Swiss-Prot record:
Organism: Arabidopsis thaliana (Mouse-ear cress)
Cysteine-cysteine disulfides: none
Note: Ecotype cv. Columbia does not respond with a hypersensitive response to hopA1.
Keyword line: Acetylation, ATP-binding, Hydrolase, Leucine-rich repeat, NAD, Nucleotide-binding, Plant defense, Repeat
Function: Disease resistance (R) protein that specifically recognizes the hopA1 type III effector avirulence protein from Pseudomonas syringae. Resistance proteins guard the plant against pathogens that contain an appropriate avirulence protein via an indirect interaction with this avirulence protein. That triggers a defense system including the hypersensitive response, which restricts the pathogen growth.
Gene that encodes the chain: RPS6
Protein name per UniProt: Disease resistance protein RPS6
GO biological process annotation, one example: defense response to bacterium
């Protein structure tokens, strides 16, 4: 046999070659096994179902000879295949020739039957040997005996297959001496990153591949790269991690030079090769490096070095390196990756809220979740950090061990940047290395965060900042992102931009942007602004009063952007404005003027708006904007919504590029000026609820108009000529539709009150209409059958038509997915006009039953029958709706029958397991319904909300508090489940509805006081009613390996504390009691779709992810046991 040294020095292409009979294991054991190998970054040979023949395929032979370990899966039909047996011969040959390691697995097979070729396995083997030579049979027998004598894995001796697979994978790692470092195992979310990177790295490929890791500063790119480097290094002949430290150390003797220098480049290559070959003195010359590493399989990580010269010097060409090499480039600059033809890019995204909270808790508390009394504070701090991992870790470490009072005092200060965070983020800004890009960054941080990209480009069009190129550079460097045409900058980067501006001068009026309330108030009140100020942004919700000096803007004649705004237009907060009558100046260079709740009747008389691009003055006191005609060629958007005193619109004849005009709720406006006929680019006109508007100039045909809203214009006497190509029209509560209306391209139409939905109207509508809303018309009694001509109609809303009795029959609107007939109080028959409806609202109708035919609505997700006072029964066929997520029968005061089960066995087949967690039923104020029977008869997972003041006796454990203790209970299964009930009291609420979350957490305790906590089980509910509510829901806590480790071995967890809590900070809600019924007491629980034998949470994948935790906990238990024995 070859020595281990020769074996280990061999350059293997694969770590593992699996030999198996596909008939037995390909789609079962093998698929799980290969998935676990991939997860652990173990490279396996995959045959991709090579067509089998009698002789061994050359590709397979190459795979065997170039694999470090052969895993032979003996199964029932393994010996039936000459192919498998020939594979085995080659494996034994490699084992003898160069020390290939072999691991046998006996899958539902007695090892002795393989070893001796007896039993069913022996019979199958003898059948295969027919017509074979004696020599061939002998060699097969010897190979079977040889491999079967090796200590391997017998599946019968394992409790579950998942555990065995994980053990085999760890065994392989151990045999290869590539056990991964534990340095990164506790990092939250790191396994997800490694799994995603694994697919990009494609380690089983022999190509030399370059992969990029891209994302903003502080998001964890380097951490991911180091975790990968730690885990993968031992699988390569050489590995080098190149970062700023490596470069600076390598270049110490060349301080002051740069990499363009020839000698510098050689010196850097020499340092690189010294790492590759682990030698100090290496002599090189031009072109030597690529020749020296050409046959070396190397792992190279270049971290956060956006220096083209570094990449050119060390990894300019992939062909420099040996087969299977991987080069990982970590950067904030996506352009840098594209410029170097790196197409495989992993974008590192911000963690979810749950992961962010866990990251913070690891840093602050050294555990995954906060103590109960720190829950809200921890969530607030995580929010302040904007989910940025760097911020979460820094803030967590700063607050670790500090009392709650200090946390509360510190919260206001967390708005600023911590020194370490600021320093890290500042590197990203300095890396722009371009004054124009830096200026755009500051503009976005101080003025434009959250604005539309198209608006920003227009507002900066004359700035000489090369906006298109600059925005692309900022996106590439992860300093901003673009979503749905909106520009977003992370809160910490935004704070960095503001901090950079603050350092421009100790005098706020000398800075380019004013962003802090105190500074703005000081500058405006004391008239200290200068020509250096380009923009001001002020949220008026932050102050109760504002003093503005009469000449405050005269010194700021370069001011381009003025944003005095509120995010809470729906709240009538009073702000005391101190604006003198002599205030008569705004800078004429203004391009953006947003001044919500502007307190004066008119803009300053000396204001010249010629440069305006966007004018937004919602809920102002304006009666008019200005007098006369101004050149407004740059104006694109005018928004005066809610300016109830506005009596006139200025002459807009020179606003030829205006695209959006929003005047809704300008209730004093009587007419539009005739100059709107010149607005040839206007595409959105909103005049809704201008309830004094009487006339629109005749003869106006706005050819570009796409959206028109005249809803609530109840005095409108004349219509403008509506363009035929308009796609969205709302003429609710207006005059009758013109008889000559032809809307060829209309997509959405909203009508109400006096308009009649008659056949003549239907002929005016385009068959392409997708949404039709018709409401508040008491004279409307029937829907014309011609509605079937709207063959693309998706949403039909006929609301509050109290004399509507029926809908047409015999039609099927195939495209209809949403139907709303709410408050049609005379409607008695259940609608039957489409079988594809997913959302059906029949609330406050006169319908008396949910019929058997409800099962035809197979796609129904939401059913609302709230307030159907005539409803008597709900057909059990509703239980067959496998997509149903929510049904509301609240205030159905006559409802007496609501059987939800049908045949539980049938529903188990019909309904998917993962559907039940979302099915919610509301039976509040259904006083004639036997609610106890409804609860008791539920044999599958539901969430119910009912009327009640106390937990029913059906629940065997009850309390008036929020927790229940079960002192003597055996926890020995792979799950813990029960039916829970809480009493929620709703005192009052001002909104239409109130939503709340109930979380359930279990603590499992043993007789020594050891314990572990489950993950929280969340539930989300909505109610519109006051009083006491019973909320009933089933809770499942599947135990992955992380938890089952606690349940086996020496300790018995026989005590469970169950905690219910409202997670909403809402004083109107109170949790006044709770109860549980253990799963063994719930009828037919074992037959539920969510029962443990098919519960998604109890699966092999989740078990496989917990191996390191399981080993660590076993060691902890052993240490604890030793202590107990030594007492």
């Amino acid at each position: 046999m070859a020595s281990s040294s020769s074996s280990s020095s061999r350059n293997w292409s694969y770590h593992v070659f699996p030999s198996f009979s596909g008939e037995d294991v390909r789609n079962t054991f093998l698929s799980h096994f290969l998935k676990e190998l991939d997860r652990k970054l173990i490279i396996s040979f995959k045959d991709n179902e090579i067509e089998r023949s009698q002789s061994l395929d050359p590709e397979l032979k190459h795979g065997i000879r170039n694999s470090r370990i052969a895993v032979v899966v003996f199964s029932k039909t393994y010996a039936s295949s000459s192919w498998c047996l020939n594979e085995l011969l080659e494996i034994v040959k490699c084992k003898k020739e160069f020390g290939q390691l072999v691991i046998p697995i006996f899958y539902n097979l007695d090892p002795s039957h393989v070893r001796k070729q007896t039993g069913d396995f022996g019979k199958i083997f003898e059948k295969t040997c027919r017509n074979k030579t004696v020599d061939e049979k002998i060699r097969w027998k010897e190979a079977l005996t040889d491999v079967a004598n090796i200590l391997g894995y017998h599946i019968v001796t394992w409790d579950n297959e998942a555990s065995m697979i994980e053990e085999i994978a760890n065994d392989i790692l151990g045999k290869m001496n590539i056990s991964p470092s534990n340095d990164f195992e506790d990092l939250v979310g790191i396994e997800d990153h490694i799994t995603k990177m694994s697919s990009l790295l494609h380690l089983e490929s022999e190509e030399v591949r370059m992969v990029g890791i891209w994302g903003p500063s502080g998001i964890g790119k380097t951490t991911i790269a180091r975790a990968l480097f730690s885990r993968l290094s031992c699988q390569f002949q050489s590995s080098v991690f190149i970062d700023k430290v490596f470069i600076s150390k390598s270049m110490e003797v060349y301080s002051g030079a740069n990499l363009v220098d020839y000698n510098m480049k050689l010196h850097l290559q020499r340092a690189f090769l010294a790492e590759i070959f682990d030698k100090k003195d290496i002599k090189i010359h031009v072109g030597a490096m690529e020749k020296m590493v050409k046959h070396r399989k190397a792992l190279i990580v270049i971290d956060d070095l956006d220096d083209q010269d570094v990449l050119d010097a060390l990894a300019d060409q992939t062909q420099w390196f040996g087969s299977g090499s991987r080069i990982i480039v970590v950067t904030e600059n996506k352009h840098f990756l594209r410029a170097n033809r790196i197409d495989h890019i992993y974008k590192v995204c911000l963690p979810s809220n749950a992961l962010a909270l866990e990251m913070f808790c690891r840093s602050a508390f050294k555990k995954n979740s906060p103590p109960d009394d720190f829950l809200e504070l921890s969530s607030e701090v995580a929010l302040r950090a904007g989910n940025l991992p760097l911020g979460l870790n820094v803030l967590g470490s700063n607050l670790r061990g500090i009392n709650k009072g200090y946390w509360i005092d510190m919260l206001p200060r967390l708005q600023g940047l911590d020194g370490k965070i600021g320093k890290t983020l500042r590197v990203s800004y300095d890396g722009l290395n371009n004054r124009k890009d830096e200026a755009i960054f500051r503009h976005i941080a101080c003025i434009f965060n959250g604005e539309k990209v198209s608006d920003i480009k227009l507002l900066l069009a004359n700035s000489n900042l090369d906006v298109n190129i600059g925005l692309k550079n900022l996106v590439d460097r992860s300093l901003i992102c673009e979503r749905f045409n909106t520009l977003e900058m992370h809160s910490l980067l935004q704070e960095l931009g503001k901090e950079i501006v603050r350092t421009q001068s100790n005098q706020p009026g000398e800075r380019e942007f004013l962003v802090d309330l105190k500074d703005i108030c000081d500058v405006l009140e004391h008239n200290t602004g200068t020509k250096k100020v380009l923009g001001i942004t002020l949220d008026i919700d932050e102050t109760d009063e504002l003093h503005i000096h009469e000449s405050s803007f005269k010194g700021m004649h370069n001011l381009l952007f003025l944003k005095i705004y509120t995010k809470k237009l729906d709240q009538k907060k009073k702000v005391r404005w101190h604006l003198p009558e002599r205030f008569d100046y705004l800078p004429s260079r203004l391009r953006l003027l947003r001044f919500d709740r502007y307190p004066s009747k008119c803009l300053p008389s000396n204001f010249h708006p010629e440069n305006l691009v966007k004018l937004q003055m919602q809920q102002s006191k304006l009666e008019k904007l200005w007098d006369g005609v101004h050149s407004l060629a740059g104006l694109r958007n005018m928004d005066l919504r809610g300016s109830r005193n506005l009596k006139e619109i200025p002459d807009l004849s020179m606003a030829t590029n205006l695209e959006t005009l929003k005047l809704s709720s300008c209730s004093s406006l009587v007419e539009l000026p005739s100059s709107i006929q010149y607005l040839n680019k206007l595409n959105d006109l909103d005049m809704s609820y201008c309830d004094h508007l009487e006339t629109i100039p005749s003869g106006v045909n706005l050819k570009s108009l796409d959206r028109l809203n005249l809803s609530g214009c109840s005095r409108l006497k004349s219509f403008l000529d509506i363009p035929t190509n308009i796609s969205w029209l709302d003429i609710g509560q207006t005059a009758d539709i013109p008889s000559n209306l032809r809307l060829q391209n209309l997509d959405e139409l909203i009508l109400c009150e006096r308009v009649q939905l008659r056949t003549p109207l239907m002929t005016m509508l385009s068959p392409t209409l997708t949404r039709l809303t018709f409401s508040n018309n008491p004279s409307f009694v029937e829907v014309p059958s011609s509605i079937q001509n709207l063959y693309q109609l998706e949403h039909l809303e006929i609301m509050n038509c109290r004399n509507l009795v029926t809908l047409p029959t015999g039609i099927n609107l195939d495209s209809l997915i949403s139907l709303d007939l709410s408050h049609c109080s005379q409607l008695k028959t259940f609608p039957d006009i489409s079988t594809n409806i997913s959302d059906l609202n029949l609330s406050y109708t006169a319908i008396e039953e949910v019929p058997l035919s409800i099962e035809k609505l197979s796609l129904l997700c939401y059913l609302d029958m709230n307030g159907c006072s005539n409803l008597l029964c709900v057909s059990p066929n509703i239980s067959k709706l496998k997509h149903l997520e929510r049904a509301d029968f609240s205030d159905c005061v006559e409802l007496t029958e609501a059987s939800w089960n049908g045949s539980s066995s049938e529903m188990v087949k019909l309904l998917p397991a993962d559907n039940f967690s979302t099915v919610k039923l509301n039976f509040i104020n259904c006083f004639k319904l036997d609610l106890t029977a409804l609860i008791q008869n539920q044999t599958f997972f539901m969430q119910l909300i009912l009327t009640g003041e106390e937990v029913p006796s059906y629940f065997t454990h009850r309390t008036s508090g929020d927790s229940i203790s079960l002192p003597h209970i055996s926890v020995c299964q792979s799950f813990f489940s029960f039916r829970g009930c809480t009493v929620i009291d709703v005192d009052s609420f001002s909104t239409i509805s109130v939503s709340f979350d109930i979380e359930v957490c279990c603590r499992f305790i043993d007789r020594f006081g050891n314990h572990f906590d489950s993950t929280d089980f969340p539930g989300y509910f909505i109610t519109t009613k006051l009083g006491g509510h019973l909320v009933v829901f089933d809770c499942y806590f599947p135990f992955n390996e992380e938890f089952t480790t606690f349940l086996d071995g020496q300790f018995n967890y026989d005590h469970v504390d169950i905690q219910f809590r409202l997670t909403n900070d809402n004083s109107q809600l109170k949790l006044k009691g709770c109860g549980i019924l253990l799963s063994e007491d719930v009828p037919s629980l074992d037959n539920r779709p969510c029962s443990p034998n098919i519960l998604p949470g109890v699966c092999e994948d989740s078990a496989l992810e917990r191996r390191s935790f399981r080993t660590k906990m076993r060691m902890m238990r052993m240490r604890l046991l030793k202590k107990l024995l030594n007492r």
